[in-house]
From Swiss-Prot:
Gene Ontology CC: membrane
Source species of the chain: Human herpesvirus 6A (strain Uganda-1102) (HHV-6 variant A)
Residues covered by the Ig-like C2-type domain: 146-236
Protein location: Membrane
Transmembrane segments: 268-288
Range of residues in the leader sequence: 1-17
Extracellular side: 18-267
Membrane topology designation: Single-pass membrane protein
UniProt protein name: Putative OX-2 membrane glycoprotein homolog
Length: 290
């Protein structure tokens, strides 16, 4: 062996000794509140793994110690080494560790049920390989689809419309009526126990005649993060409540109310048709008597 190779051997040993694989994980997870969330962390090796740990900030929440892999019996798909239950802020944590010998891969799975918006958090998984530690962090984002409730009633000569929406994050709420969009700069907002917000918007519309608004479409439109929901109803002569989870396009907010246009043209045509029928019947009766 040459003198150059002899001098390079210590350097190669130092480099190889400090070369550590980095875990693979999803940096960002998006789930709906109430879902079971799965954090996963994978390392492309099954050699010399001493432990796999999960941390919530600096607090240890799950730890798998690997004592002696030689005594483990592996299946073709992998072997579940430890099944562990723990707590994160009173949340049940279901943690499992898999060794996939065929693929030379170690995977750690950690499951929680996200009950509220406050369960959104970042978890860090740490693999200890020999005496080296290598980590990766995954952050959870939560959302709640808007629950939309539309209510209207008459107060003397006014149509009173209230739109109430519950979602997370806090929704933007508008009322659409007679082709116009109405919103409040400062709506009524209530915070709920699960971290969601309930936003209420109210408007009154003066009617010139008793039946002016009957048959017109009134809609409650809500947008929260990437989700749009609405509730719509035809105005009646009394009070009415409707709850809906239909999705809508934001373009619909800008467009005219097609339902009202159809109603505006349909009613006069029906009245004209009825008048013609009555006139024909009258002519027939007169002709028959004569």
């Amino acid at each position: 062996m040459s003198s150059l190779m002899l001098r390079l051997l210590p350097l190669l040993y130092i480099i190889s000794a400090h070369f550590v694989l980095h875990p693979e994980t999803s940096p960002s997870l998006i789930y709906e509140i109430g879902s079971i969330v799965t954090f996963h962390c994978r390392l492309e090796t099954t050699t010399n793994i001493r432990s796999v740990s999960w941390y919530n900030k600096n607090r240890l929440i799950s730890n798998h110690e690997v004592q002696n892999m030689d005594n483990l019996s592996f299946t073709d798909d992998g072997y579940v080494l430890i099944h562990e239950l723990n707590k994160i802020n009173n949340l049940a944590v279901d943690s499992k560790l898999y060794f996939h010998i065929k693929h030379n891969r170690t995977t750690s799975l950690l499951k929680i049920k996200a009950k509220s918006a406050y369960d959104a958090t970042c978890l860090t998984c740490t693999f200890t390989v020999d005496n080296e530690k290598t980590s990766a962090t995954s952050c959870l984002k939560l959302f709640m689809k808007p629950i939309v409730v539309l209510y209207f009633r008459y107060l003397d000569n006014f149509l009173d419309v209230t739109c109430t929406v519950t979602s997370y994050p806090k929704p933007n709420v508008v009322i659409k009526f007679l082709g116009e969009v109405y919103k409040r700069d400062i709506p009524i907002v209530r915070q709920n126990e699960n971290g969601s917000s309930t936003v209420s918007v109210n408007f009154t519309f003066k009617r010139r005649t008793k039946l002016e608004f009957v048959g017109k479409t009134v809609s409650c439109l809500a947008s929260s993060w990437f989700t749009n929901q609405k509730a719509s109803a035809l105005v009646t002569s009394g009070e009415h409540t409707v709850q809906n989870h239909d999705e809508y396009s934001k373009e619909g907010v800008k467009s005219s109310n097609s339902d009202e246009t159809v109603f505006t043209w349909t009613v006069p045509l029906i009245l004209i048709l009825i008048s013609v029928i009555v006139l024909l019947i009258s002519v027939c009766i007169v002709a028959f008597k004569s």
